């Protein structure tokens, strides 16, 4: 993921637009657009220690780990 895919802040409306392919998702916060770009990338770096299932976002792993509470 690079500056080309993230875009830049506009001087008029402070929008950031995803430049990936034909996707034009727009947000005002850089961390939101970088989080969004993960939907375009097949990487899943957050792995569950209990079952090995992998997730793109740490918050998704955290939610998943709670399902193992009864294990």
UniProtKB/Swiss-Prot annotation:
Pfam families: zf-C2H2
One GO location term (cellular component): nucleus
Membrane among keywords: no
Alphabetical list of InterPro entries matching this protein: pacC/RIM101, Znf_C2H2_sf, Znf_C2H2_type
Zinc finger map (C2H2-type): 16-40, 46-68
Gene3D superfamilies: Classic Zinc Finger
Subcellular location: Nucleus
Family stated for the protein in its record: Belongs to the pacC/RIM101 family.
Function noted in UniProt: Transcription factor that mediates regulation of both acid- and alkaline-expressed genes in response to ambient pH. At alkaline ambient pH, activates transcription of alkaline-expressed genes (including pacC itself) and represses transcription of acid-expressed genes.
Protein name per the record: pH-response transcription factor pacC/RIM101
């Amino acid at each position: 993921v690079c500056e080309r895919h993230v875009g830049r802040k506009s001087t008029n409306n402070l929008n950031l637009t995803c430049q990936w392919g034909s996707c034009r998702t727009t947000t005002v916060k850089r961390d939101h657009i970088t989080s969004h770009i993960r939907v375009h990338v097949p990487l899943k770096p957050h792995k569950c220690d209990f079952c090995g299932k992998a997730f793109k976002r740490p918050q998704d792993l955290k939610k998943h780990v709670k399902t193992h509470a009864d294990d």
